[in-house]
Amino acid sequence: MAHPKLKMLDAFSDVVEITGKTAGKESWDDESTIAMPSYKLSVLSDADAVREVKIFLTGLFVRSSPRAIAAALIMTWNMRSVDPVAVRIFPAKDKGKDTADVDVKNLEVPGVDYIDAMVETNVKDASDIEIIRAGAFIAASTLKMFAKSFTGWTQAWEHKHIQKRYADFCKTEYPFKEFTTNNKCAETMYEAYQGQKLYQGTLGRILYALGDVADPRQTEMLFDQHLANTGMHIIPQFTNAQLSIGATTAGLLSALNYGQNFGTLMQLKKLINESLSKPPGPDNRATWRFARIFDPSVFQTLQTKYCADTVAILANINSMGKLSTETSNPLNIAVLKQMAPERKRYTRQVAKNIYHHFMVVARALNNDMFDTDKYKFVESDDEEEHVANEGETPVKE
């Protein structure tokens, strides 16, 4: 099928290119995560932790306050392990400079009761350790609102997903009487997380310290996975696609290049070389994964809305490679769902070409057994038997 050719006019050769993007930052260092002002994070006694949980629960389910929102972060820092001893999982002190840190007690207004009677009633049958462990678990679950809408959290609470996860994870009964979702309180918490630097700075201390957590299962389940790679679907889609089709990093980057996305692929290459390829450890906290929470200009070219075609190609590869489920289909990414039908068809065909190259062509170069273009056996009528009947010879095309 012939296509018309574009004739470029010299009159437009000196025009300044418009990309729709502002100049963004191409890197992020771990120290930036702990450089922001924060509320003071400290080890709480059991008695103080119980009070902090009650303040947090009052703010989430009864009446919101800046003090209660800060309590969510304080209790996340005081999360407990699932074993009977219930020891703290975060270090005693965060790594940030504490000269400008704010004491949460400064948020308390004299004469205001920060603990509601309903909260006292709902937790009264639980032991102190149960209150602390369950309260911190719920508090940590709200941190996803730093990157995602509060409606996702309220729906999870209404369907008892969070309560069930606590029971399953801790192998014990959920200890509180039922709290009814308060959408207004959840929305206020979401807006505070999204818009106020002190809360974000406190989150930064928590995320930096994830590398010090011996058993990260709770943190990964409750907020790590939800906050990582904010708005950058290209990163998990790329790594999943590489795993799915067995491509080299250079091979997949090359296959994805169509010229206009070269800058995106070069930024991805830079991120792979400087951060993604390095194992986490004391000298690599991998906080780049959360950078866009604190500075939206970081890795801007990797934001999905600026590289939708590339993400769509990768998502289609993963869909073909079955690295998706009914509930986590990569093609359900909002930006991809909004693409025009023609664009969806085009990117899917490109994905098929890439998938075919690495799954058939590249393998066939090393072993004829994988050359399914050249050698094909006739399938049985029910299409469940992919082996030729005895005595048959392969059909060459």
UniProtKB/Swiss-Prot annotation:
Location of this chain's protein in the cell: Virion; Host cytoplasm
Record carries keyword Ribonucleoprotein: yes
A single MF term (Gene Ontology): RNA binding
Keywords: Capsid protein, Helical capsid protein, Host cytoplasm, Ribonucleoprotein, RNA-binding, Viral nucleoprotein, Virion
Pfam families: Rhabdo_ncap_2
Record flagged with keyword Hydrolase: no
GO-annotated cellular components: helical viral capsid; host cell cytoplasm; ribonucleoprotein complex; viral nucleocapsid
Top-level lineage group: Viruses
Broad class of where this protein is predominantly found: virion
InterPro entries noted in UniProt: Rhabdo_ncap_2
Subunit structure and binding partners: Homomultimerizes to form the nucleocapsid. Binds to viral genomic RNA.
Role this protein plays: Encapsidates the genome, protecting it from nucleases. The encapsidated genomic RNA is termed the nucleocapsid (NC) and serves as template for viral transcription and replication.
Protein name: Nucleoprotein
